[in-house]
Structures are given as C-alpha cells and as structure tokens.
Amino acid sequence: MVRWSRWFMANSHKDVGTMYLMLGMWSGFGGLNLSWMMRLELSRPGMWLPSSEVYNGIVTLHAIMMIFSFVMPVLIGGFGNWLLPMMLGSIDMSFPRLNTFSFWVLPPALYLVIVSCFIDYGSGTGWTMYPVPLSSTPYSGGISTDLMILGLHLAGISSSAESINYLVTFLNVRSKSFKAEFSPLFVWALAVTSFLLLVSLPVLAGGLTMLIMDRDFNCSFFDPSGGGDPVLFQHLFWFFGHPEVYVLILPGFGLVSHVLVFYTKKLRVFGSVAMMYAMISIGVLGFIVWGHHMYTVGLDVDTRFYFTAVTMLIAVPTGVKVFSWIATIYGSYLSFEAPTLWVLGFIMKFTMGGITGVILSNACLDVALHDTYYVVAHFHYVLSMGAVFTIFAGYIHYFPFFTSKLFSPVLARGHFFLTFVGVNLTFFPQHFLGLGGMPRRIPDYPIFYYYWNQWSTIGCAMVMVSVSLFIHMQWEA
C-alpha cells in the first residue's frame, strides 16, 4: 500500500508529470483503437457497424480522447510538469496541491466521456457538439450527451487550474536577474499555451452550460423555435476551438526547438528571440480567426474576406518558426538518432499540413471543401503528424532523463519509419477523397471512393503495428 500511496498523494512535479504521461499514453492507445474501428468501417462500401449512430459515437469519443486525454495531458501536463520547474531553476511548481488537483480531475472526466458512449448509441455529435440538430434533445435525447458535456466541463476545470499554476510559476518562480526573454522556448510555449487556455476555456464553459440548459431545463439559447440561434453556439465553440489547436501544437514547438539544439550541437536555436515573439503572435492571432471554421453558415462576404486575410496572416509567424528550425539544422553535424528523425518528420509534415491550411483559409475554396475528407487530412497532418511526432521526439529524447534507461536505437528508428510511412499512407489519400467530394463523419460511401479508402486503411494497420513496436520498445527498456 505504501508504494501506491506515493502516487495517490503525490505533490512532486515529477510524480504528477509521470501520472499525466501514463494517463495520456493510455488514452492515446484507446483513441487509436477507435480510429482503427473507423478505418475498418471505411475499408469497403457497406455497413459493418450496427448503425451510423454507433459510428458517430466512435468519431466523437476518438476526437475527445485524443485531444483532451492524450495530446493535452502529455504535452502540457506531462512534459510541462517535468521540465518547467527545472528549466526555471525551481524545486517545484508554485502550487503543488493545485497541480495534483488538476491531474485528479482528469480521470473522472475521462470516465464520464467513455461511459457516455455505452449509453444508448453514444453521443454521436462529433467533438463540436453543434446544437440543432446534433446535440438537441429531439435528436440526442438520452443522457449520453449530458455526460459528455459534464466530462468536458471537468476537463476544462483541470486545464484552467493547470494553466494558472504554470503562469504563476513562470512569473514568480523565475529568478529576478533571469529575464523573461532569455527563458527557454519550451517555457515560453507553456506560458502562451496557458494564456490561451485561460482566455478561451470560460467561453467554452459558457457555451456548454447554455447547451445543457437548452437540453434539460427548457431554455432556448440555440433553438430557433424559441428565438435562439444555433450559429451563436458555433461562435462560442470556435472562439475556444481555434485557440485550442494552438494549445495542442505550441508545447510541441518548444520541444522541437530543444531537441534540435541538442542534436545539432549548437548553443541555441536560430533566432530564439524571434521564435519567442512568433509564438506570442500565433497566440494573439489565434483568437481572431475562429470564423474560418464557419464559412458555410451564412457569413456575409466582408466577414469571410476578413477571416480569410487574418487566417493567412498566421502563416507568417509559423513560417518564422519553420525557417528558424531549418536554419538551426543548416551547417550542423546532425546525428540521425530517433528524436532527430521525429523532428525532421515533424518539420516536413507540419509544413504540408500548413500548406493545406492556407488552401482551406480561402473562403471560396473552403465552401467546396468544408466537411470533406480534405479537412480531415489537413488537421491530421497538423495533429497526427505534428503534435504526435513532437510527443515521440520529446519522449524518446527525455526518456533517459526521466527513467535513467535507454530505448534500443534500432527499435526506435524502426518505430519512426513504420509510423512515418503508416500515417502518410493513412492521410495523404484523404486529400484525393476530399477533392472528390467524400463527406466526413459518414460511415458508408459509393464504390467510387473505394480505392483510396483501401490505401488509407492499410496505412492505419501499419500505424497499429508501429504502436505495438513502441510498446515492445518500452517494455524492453
């Protein structure tokens, strides 16, 4: 019991960070299995699952587990807790008990989200939970959607508490002689991420509370029959939802900078101050571009022009970061160890995802491509090959520091190449499916789309094998 009580009563930032990593990895495996179920359904025309409601429930659970229970806990909670105090020269976080609280709120949140999918047909709303029709009572009348909303509320409480802790630690624990500009880039990434979460999460909480009032207390915030407006929910959700995608990738930017500096054997990353201001710019611009998710809801031409222009503007600070990483690599004696491979893969595939993002930022093109597999391919290139690649780069790089053990270099490289080929084979064909007009979140399709869906399923099978190799690699270490 003594060994278990260490974890139940942990206040140390290292113990809490380890628990975040364990929860995140478990959720990542769960989310991957759900994606494999989706790919099996889409591997050939016709239905394999009992109904489309079950398929939509799988889509919803996959998205929420991957975003709120995998990428955020690992990048922000795991690496943040382990590295932030050490990079600032502190013995712990400013509020160790708040740190513990922010972790222990997450397992109940994950429990509510998972349980919701075993009630009725699950919550088939997608992670966006659009009301009228998807999450409205006539169409999602059971308790499953309510449990999903409560689970998201708990995840939001956890992230808010965590963000307060990180910001206070960043501002107060740092030595007064140690200027903020010279803080490591990962520290700055966490500071910007915490700011994004603190500003955007209350808006999501308000939107979800209004939604649950509509569902259970006869209000009509979003119901047109009672004078409400469903587009209001989209504005509230995407004001949170777009900063959220930067929350997922910014800590990864910081990790990539640190891993690159180590393996290029340079003193610092190229243009480190510009990199810092680029992250701040991305954070600020992230709050004023949410409308690009809503081009098809009836925004007027001037509004769509504004959101197109500002969305393209985000490519500037992002380009500063990408070219600074390339300049850091230039002229260095790069050792092709596993973390370096993950970083190089990240730079290539994140750039690819950014290019498709600029294409989708055009309102005239997005009207045609909205809710097709082109959008799925775009954000999976940014997340499945962006955020996840940074997680593996950081994890393999810092694993000896965390555990005093080493991964097998051969297995680590093999894991990278198998994953790299697998995710590309999974998501690259989806660009063609989207350009051909295949809609997302639909479990069946005409025979016309069979060829590229088959390749996509083969790629997903390769990713499943690579994850098995990762588990073996972990076990062997």
Swiss-Prot record:
PANTHER family with a match to the protein in the record: CYTOCHROME C OXIDASE SUBUNIT 1 (PTHR10422:SF18)
Keyword Metal-binding part of the UniProt annotation: yes
Organism taxonomic ancestry: Eukaryota, Metazoa, Spiralia, Lophotrochozoa, Mollusca
E.C. code: 7.1.1.9
UniProt: Cu cation binding residues: 242, 292-293
Entry's transmembrane regions: 16-36, 64-84, 101-121, 149-171, 185-205, 236-256, 269-289, 309-329, 340-360, 382-402, 416-436, 455-475
Binding-site positions, O2: 246
SUBUNIT field: Component of the cytochrome c oxidase (complex IV, CIV), a multisubunit enzyme composed of a catalytic core of 3 subunits and several supernumerary subunits. The complex exists as a monomer or a dimer and forms supercomplexes (SCs) in the inner mitochondrial membrane with ubiquinol-cytochrome c oxidoreductase (cytochrome b-c1 complex, complex III, CIII).
Enzyme class: translocase
Keywords: Calcium, Copper, Electron transport, Heme, Iron, Magnesium, Membrane, Metal-binding, Mitochondrion, Mitochondrion inner membrane, Respiratory chain, Translocase, Transmembrane, Transmembrane helix, Transport
Identification of the protein by name: Cytochrome c oxidase subunit 1
Biological process according to GO: electron transport coupled proton transport; mitochondrial electron transport, cytochrome c to oxygen
Membrane topology: Multi-pass membrane protein
Function: Component of the cytochrome c oxidase, the last enzyme in the mitochondrial electron transport chain which drives oxidative phosphorylation. The respiratory chain contains 3 multisubunit complexes succinate dehydrogenase (complex II, CII), ubiquinol-cytochrome c oxidoreductase (cytochrome b-c1 complex, complex III, CIII) and cytochrome c oxidase (complex IV, CIV), that cooperate to transfer electrons derived from NADH and succinate to molecular oxygen, creating an electrochemical gradient over the inner membrane that drives transmembrane transport and the ATP synthase.
CDD domains (alphabetical): Cyt_c_Oxidase_I
GO MF annotation, one: metal ion binding
Cofactor binding note of this UniProt entry: Binds 2 heme A groups non-covalently per subunit.
Family named by the database record: Belongs to the heme-copper respiratory oxidase family.
Transit peptide keyword on record: no
Cross-link entry 1'-histidyl-3'-tyrosine (His-Tyr), positions: 242-246
